[in-house]
């Protein structure tokens, strides 16, 4: 980047190793009681298949839920002999957005059961990690620079299905530590108008990243 921007190849002797964010894996060790607690909370039997998403409930600054609802519904239609539950753990910034999540869940799922869990309830979040069978996060916003939840999913022993996007590319090795779903981005130049609105101060950062 510096060479392209300045026209001079920089010589940097200082090494800057990347030390990613980590988790205390002992907190995610198998906990049968917590697993049973989550399944009782959502009405899931032990043989049912539970998918977990954990993150902010915001369309523009985390992940649009509809692709995840469709994915859960697709699994439910394939697993004819097992009931599928999709647990959405997190919080919405306001009641209007939360209601839109509820409405879209009802509109896009029929066989899969969608459950919403308070992301500020530490005990229930812990139980969610333990009670799930798979982790799903199709993040699609430009501020997802790292993404800690796939690391937590791996610590909990859950197979992770994530979008092939931004920081998730660094934490999930496709086919080895999880599965990355291909994404599509606009062609170069398409974002000029949005960048201009942000740079000129007409849009704030929150709107820009959405």
Regions found by a protein language model. Name each.
Residues 1-23:
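Helix-loop-beta element that forms the nucleotide-linked donor phosphate-binding surface
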Residues 176-189, 196-203, 207:
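A short acidic/histidine/glycine-rich donor-binding loop in glycosyltransferase catalytic cores
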Residues 119-122, 127-132:
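Short alpha-helical donor nucleotide-sugar binding micro-motif in glycosyltransferases
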Residues 147-150, 168:
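Short glycine/serine-rich donor-binding loops of glycosyltransferases
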Residues 7, 21-119:
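Conserved catalytic-core segment of nucleotide-activated headgroup transferases in glycan assembly
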Residues 130-145, 158:
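Acidic donor-binding loop of glycosyltransferase active sites
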Residues 159-162, 172, 179:
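Short hydrophobic beta-strand element within catalytic cores of glycosyltransferases
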